[in-house]
């Protein structure tokens, strides 16, 4: 939900982009004293070790995330936006913005995550402003399953037919939003070649957020390209009333509080 919170905030001004600036300087060897050169070499070595350590930590965290995600997931929003939970939404909104504003807040929040277009169609539709995210599953996916022990991600359609089942390996981090990037070990994985996973789990945020597709670069873009205005959200197929209540409360709090 932390990722969706950032996206909703940015979507309000249609500014889902950021830049990472890296500076460096260099000098000639002849103009650097031996002591300074040694110090520089030591600094470079230290930076390299720190970077290597960060990579190791991210890779370990990615493996842990797959373990924590072990289980099966269905689309989030059809579950928690069902009519039977509307009063829960209104109660949580009331606690944050007051009874007189609760219904409007609920309508606004729900509208931002229930868009019905994504990709280039969404880019065209929202060219003059506005915009809502499509947060469902794509490519006929109905149930997504993680097996952390074998690093396997698989999916089935609404009839239970297997759409894909591959082992995946960690390939890096998305620097802006902190998604863990995984790539299939199978050459022909189509739209399930890459999975970008937010660090959300059922235990901590009561839901998960992720993207998947065949183009890693396009998956890093949120307001352009074939995956624009799309962020899949899921909830455990074993979710209970408590998990649903907690998920609704978290979403309201992160987007309406203070």
How would you describe each model-predicted region?
Residues 75-81, 156-159:
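Generic short beta-strand segments
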Residues 56-74:
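N-terminal helix-cap/turn-to-beta initiation motif at the start of protein domains
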Residues 21-36, 40:
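Bacterial lipoprotein signal-peptidase II cleavage site
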Residues 79-114:
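Internal, charge-rich low-complexity segments
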Residues 40, 51-57:
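Immediate post-signal-peptide N-terminus of mature secreted/exported proteins
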Residues 25-28, 55, 66, 91-96, ...:
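A composition-driven surface/loop motif
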Residues 2-27:
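Sec-dependent N-terminal signal peptides of Gram-positive bacterial secreted proteins and lipoproteins
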Residues 125-258:
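Calycin-type beta-barrel ligand-binding domains and close structural analogs
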């Amino acid at each position: 939900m932390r990722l969706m919170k950032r996206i909703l905030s940015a979507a309000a001004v249609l500014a889902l982009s950021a830049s990472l600036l890296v500076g460096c300087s260099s000098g000639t060897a002849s103009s650097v004293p031996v002591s300074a050169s040694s110090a520089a070499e030591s600094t470079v070595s230290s930076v390299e070790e720190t970077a290597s350590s960060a990579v190791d930590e991210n890779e370990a965290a990615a493996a842990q995330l797959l373990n924590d995600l072990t289980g099966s997931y269905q689309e989030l929003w059809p579950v928690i936006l069902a009519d039977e939970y509307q009063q829960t939404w209104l109660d949580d909104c009331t606690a944050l913005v007051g009874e007189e504003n609760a219904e409007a807040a609920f309508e606004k929040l729900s509208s931002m995550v229930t868009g019905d277009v994504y990709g280039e169609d969404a880019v065209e539709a929202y060219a003059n402003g506005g915009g809502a995210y499509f947060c469902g599953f794509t490519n006929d996916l109905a149930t997504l399953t993680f097996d952390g022990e074998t690093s396997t991600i698989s999916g089935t359609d609404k009839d239970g037919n297997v759409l894909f089942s591959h082992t995946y390996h960690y390939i890096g981090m998305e620097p802006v939003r902190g998604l863990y990037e995984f790539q299939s070990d199978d050459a022909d994985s189509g739209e399930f070649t890459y999975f970008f996973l937010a660090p959300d789990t059922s235990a901590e945020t009561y839901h998960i957020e992720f993207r998947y597709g065949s183009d890693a670069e396009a998956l890093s873009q949120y307001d352009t390209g074939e995956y624009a205005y799309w962020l899949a959200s899921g909830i455990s197929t074993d979710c209970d009333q408590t998990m649903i209540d907690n998920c609704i409360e978290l979403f309201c709090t992160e987007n309406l509080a203070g």
